[in-house]
UniProtKB/Swiss-Prot annotation:
This is Large ribosomal subunit protein bL21. InterPro entries: bL21-like, bL21-like_sf, Ribosomal_bL21, Ribosomal_bL21_CS. The lineage of its organism: Bacteria, Pseudomonadati, Pseudomonadota, Gammaproteobacteria, Enterobacterales. HAMAP family: Ribosomal_bL21. Part of the 50S ribosomal subunit. Contacts protein L20. GO terms for molecular function: rRNA binding; structural constituent of ribosome. The gene is rplU. Disulfide bonds: none annotated. Keywords: Ribonucleoprotein, Ribosomal protein, RNA-binding, rRNA-binding. It holds the Pfam family Ribosomal_L21p. It comes from Salmonella typhimurium (strain LT2 / SGSC1412 / ATCC 700720). One of its GO terms (cellular component) is ribosome. This protein binds to 23S rRNA in the presence of protein L20. GO terms for biological process: translation.
Length: 103
């Protein structure tokens, strides 16, 4: 059984027991969260596709950890003009473990 849900402007395909990395959520570590924006649920041959969301579809997950991703360097450069700018960015994320999928 797997499902596709929407969080942080992105779509994620998950199954029970899987850990997935999402955009930062303001929820403490160890707490439970429910995602109601379920786009699709598949259980063997039975497939439910939402218009746009599945009625009564809920994905339950537990927040495992918060953190920051790898550093991305941004460079702005003009040749022969002695001009260079550098900037770094580390995106915040939340790791959640999927505990249940229901329709």
């Amino acid at each position: 059984m797997y499902a596709v849900f929407q969080s942080g402007g992105k779509q994620h395909r998950v199954s029970e027991g899987q850990t997935v990395r999402l955009e930062k959520l303001d929820i403490a570590t160890g707490e439970t969260i429910e995602f109601a924006e379920v786009l699709m649920i598949a259980n063997g041959e039975e497939v439910k596709i939402g218009v746009p969301f599945v009625d009564g579809g809920v994905i339950k997950a537990e927040v495992v950890a918060h953190g920051r991703g790898e550093k991305v360097k941004i460079v702005k450069f003009r040749r022969r003009k002695h001009y260079r700018k550098q900037q770094g960015h580390r995106q915040w994320f939340t790791d959640v473990k999927i505990t249940g999928i229901s329709a």
